[in-house]
Swiss-Prot record:
<dbReference type="GO" id="GO:1990508">
    <property type="term" value="C:CKM complex"/>
</dbReference>
<feature type="region of interest" description="Disordered">
    <location>
        <begin position="248"/>
        <end position="292"/>
    </location>
</feature>
<keyword id="KW-0010">Activator</keyword>
<dbReference type="GO" id="GO:0005634">
    <property type="term" value="C:nucleus"/>
</dbReference>
<dbReference type="GO" id="GO:0000122">
    <property type="term" value="P:negative regulation of transcription by RNA polymerase II"/>
</dbReference>
<dbReference type="GO" id="GO:0000979">
    <property type="term" value="F:RNA polymerase II core promoter sequence-specific DNA binding"/>
</dbReference>
<dbReference type="InterPro" id="IPR013763">
    <property type="entry name" value="Cyclin-like_dom"/>
</dbReference>
<feature type="compositionally biased region" description="Low complexity">
    <location>
        <begin position="330"/>
        <end position="359"/>
    </location>
</feature>
<dbReference type="InterPro" id="IPR006671">
    <property type="entry name" value="Cyclin_N"/>
</dbReference>
<dbReference type="Pfam" id="PF00134">
    <property type="entry name" value="Cyclin_N"/>
</dbReference>
<dbReference type="GO" id="GO:0031505">
    <property type="term" value="P:fungal-type cell wall organization"/>
</dbReference>
<comment type="similarity">
    <text>Belongs to the cyclin family. Cyclin C subfamily.</text>
</comment>
<keyword id="KW-0539">Nucleus</keyword>
<comment type="subunit">
    <text>Component of the SRB8-11 complex, a regulatory module of the Mediator complex.</text>
</comment>
<keyword id="KW-0805">Transcription regulation</keyword>
<keyword id="KW-0678">Repressor</keyword>
<protein>
    <recommendedName>
        <fullName>RNA polymerase II holoenzyme cyclin-like subunit</fullName>
    </recommendedName>
</protein>
Amino acid sequence: MSADYWNSSQRNQWQLTRFSLLEARRRVLLLERKMIQNGLIKDYPNIIYDYNMRIYLHNLLIKLGRRLNIRQIALATAEIYLTRFLTRVSLKEINVYLLITTCIYVACKIEECPQHIRLILSEARNIWPEYIPHDVTKLAEFEFYLIEEMDSYLLLHHPYKSLMQINEFLSNNYNVFGFKLTVEELQNAWSLINDSYITDLHLLLPPHTIAVAAIYITVVLKKNLSRVRQGNNNDNNININTMHISTGSSTNPININNNNNTNTSNNNGTTSTTTTTTAQETQVLGQDDNTEMNIDDLMNLTKSSNNSQDKSDDKMDIDNPLQSQVNLSQIQNQTQHQHQESTHNNTSSTNTGRNGINGQISQSNQELNNFDLDILDEDTIKINKFMNFLEHSHINLDEVVEAVQDMMNMYVLWNRYNEQGVKKALQVMLLNRI
C-alpha cells in the first residue's frame, strides 16, 4: 500500500468501472440463484440491494458508531468495506447486522482507533439483541471472512483529506485565485462527503474528485438555490418534504413530513454527521448548521440557471432521478460568457469616454441601467473564481459531473426512503434462520 492514492491498492485493485461493477453484482445474483436452487439458502424476494437497503445499512453503521464514539474516518472506512464485501457476497446468505459490526471492528483497527471485540459486540447486542450472538468467536470468524473477500486490501484514502488539502491550497493561493472556502462551506462539503458513502462513487472515482464534487454542490449550486427560492416564493400550494443536506448535529439529513401520506414512516438514526473526531475534524464539524433545502429546490439545482425563466421548468418530476443532470461544462461556459460580456461592456464604456465627457456619462448611465446585476452578485463572482480554479487544476471534469449526478440522485431517492419496509424484510429473513 502506497502513501499516495495513485500507487495504492485502492486504485490498482479496487477502483472499478461502471461496467465491471455491474458485472460483479450480476455474478452475485447468479451465485445467489444457484444457492437457492441447491437449497443452500432460501429465497426472499424483498431482500434487494437497492438504495433503500444502502441507506438503511448506512444508518445502522452510523448508529453503532455513535454508541462507540468512533471517528468519522473509521466509519467511512467501514462503509467502504461494507460496499466492497457486497460486490462479492449476497445479502441473503449473511447476517447484515453482524456484517456491520465486523466492518466497524476491522476499520477501527486499520484507522488506529481499535475497540475491544467484547465492547463492540456488547454495544451491538444492546442495539440489535435479536440478531447479534453472544459468542465473540462469531465476530472473529466474520472478520476473516470479510478480509478474505476484500483480498486483504484494507488501507484506504478518503475525500476528507483531499477536501482539507484543497482548502489549504486555496487559502495559501488566495492572491492567485481569489477564492477560498468559508467555515460553513467547508462543513457543508464535509457533510456531503459523509452522505456520498451511500453511493458507489468510492469504488469508481478518486477521492479528490468526490471532494471537488462536494465543493461544487456547496458553492456553485448555492447560487442556483437562491434563484430557485426567489422564483418559487409564490408557489406555496404544494407541500414539499424538507431535506437537510448539511448538518453538524444529530439532525436527520432527510426529514420526511408529507401531509398527503398517511403511512408516514419514522426514520430513526438517519445521519450525515460525525462522532468523535480529531482536532482538525472538530474544527470543521464543530458548528451546528441547520441550513435546510427543499426537495423541490434540490431538483431545480440540477438545471441550468437559464431555465429559471420558465416557470414550468421549475418543477421537475422527482419520480425520475435520471432527470437530475448537472452540466458542469455548461455552467463553466456560462460563467466565461459572463466574463466576456463584462469585459466587452467595460471596453465600450472606455471607448465612448475617449470621444467626449458627455458621451461617456451618457453611455455609463445607460449601461448602468441595463447592466446584468448578476455579474455583481457575490455568489456569481465566487462561482467564476471557482471555475477559474478548476480550469487550472487539471481535474477530470467529466468525473466531477458524474460524481455530482450520483450524489444528487442519491438525495432524490433518499426522499422516498422506506425504512420500515427494509427493516421488516430483514427481520423476516433473519428470524426464519433461527
